[in-house]
């Protein structure tokens, strides 16, 4: 692995737009020239007095490779420099040499040692031209890529950039909508135990057949025993039917008797009510002194 040291503009020019976030830390990888004991070239001369002064620890930055047209840069980029190695390629070869990824990466990385080899000093990395970055792959359902990405995700690839979009489904039956602000968590990955489990509940076999009932004893319908049994059964059935008829007749007779008794009692109540009303009328017609004397007796 290469060592890290302070940034030097003479040996390692500023990175292109794809690597600009690294400018905040002001640290870059050491070039190959320092690994062999050679000293890096001194910084470029300071700016004229008319420009703003810079500190002792700062270096002037040459933006001429970025301001020139892209045609010379493309011509320089066509001739690779075999003397320098891409530090990203070495990094990936050291870290993942024993664990090759089954699926090739979909992203293109910028090489710092191949571009502009003719114009750079022999002991330093040349300034690379701005390279076009490959667009991110489109969104695909998680179920389609889950089987292909499972081995790569298990091996662990920290530098792989995966763009997950939150998928929000509506329960009303309408089509789902993609939302990046509402949901930020990636879709879940099924566990190996769930994937290997057999769906026994979904594909249940037919129920077990019940045990066969005990076979009935074969009876000869022409035998005397069978005839006697049938006669006994018929007699018992006739007796039960006769008893049911007798109970019905007794119930009907009792209902008739109770109905007649109810009518007789109703007539008696009416007669007593008439006698009571007659007596009340008689008592109302008697004089009060007679009633008072009758009360003392």
From Swiss-Prot:
GO-annotated molecular function: chromatin binding; chromatin DNA binding; DNA binding; DNA-binding transcription activator activity, RNA polymerase II-specific; DNA-binding transcription factor activity, RNA polymerase II-specific; DNA-binding transcription factor binding; DNA-binding transcription repressor activity, RNA polymerase II-specific; histone acetyltransferase binding
Region (Leucine-zipper): 249-256
Modification note: Phosphorylated at Thr-189 by MAPK and CDK2, serves to prime phosphorylation at Thr-180 and Ser-185 by GSK3B and acquire DNA-binding as well as transactivation activities, required to induce adipogenesis. MAPK and CDK2 act sequentially to maintain Thr-189 in the primed phosphorylated state during mitotical cloning expansion and thereby progression of terminal differentiation. Phosphorylation at Ser-105 enhances transactivation activity. Phosphorylation at Ser-277 in response to calcium increases transactivation activity. Phosphorylated at Thr-189 by RPS6KA1. Methylated. Methylation at Arg-3 by CARM1 and at Lys-39 by EHMT2 inhibit transactivation activity. Methylation is probably inhibited by phosphorylation at Thr-189.
Tissues expressing this chain: Liver and lung.
Region (Basic motif): 227-247
Compartment list: Nucleus; Cytoplasm
Entry-listed glycosylation sites: 181-182
Chain positions found as N6-methylated lysine: 39
Region annotated Required for Lys-134 sumoylation, chain positions: 1-22
InterPro entries the record matches: bZIP, bZIP_sf, C/EBP, C/EBP_chordates
Positions where Phosphoserine occurs in the chain: 105, 185, 240, 277
Keyword terms, alphabetized: Acetylation, Activator, Cytoplasm, Differentiation, DNA-binding, Glycoprotein, Isopeptide bond, Methylation, Nucleus, Phosphoprotein, Transcription, Transcription regulation, Ubl conjugation
SUPFAM superfamilies the UniProt entry points to: Leucine zipper domain
Region (Required for MYC transcriptional repression): 22-105
Function text: Important transcription factor regulating the expression of genes involved in immune and inflammatory responses. Also plays a significant role in adipogenesis, as well as in the gluconeogenic pathway, liver regeneration, and hematopoiesis. The consensus recognition site is 5'-T[TG]NNGNAA[TG]-3'. Its functional capacity is governed by protein interactions and post-translational protein modifications. During early embryogenesis, plays essential and redundant roles with CEBPA.
Subunit: Binds DNA as a homodimer and as a heterodimer. Interacts with MYB; within the complex, MYB and CEBPB bind to different promoter regions. Interacts with ATF4. Binds DNA as a heterodimer with ATF4. Can form stable heterodimers with CEBPA, CEBPD, CEBPE and CEBPG. Interacts with SIX1. Isoform 2 and isoform 3 also form heterodimers. Interacts with TRIM28 and PTGES2. Interacts with PRDM16. Interacts with CCDC85B. Forms a complex with THOC5. Interacts with ZNF638; this interaction increases transcriptional activation.
Protein name: CCAAT/enhancer-binding protein beta
Gene that encodes the chain: Cebpb
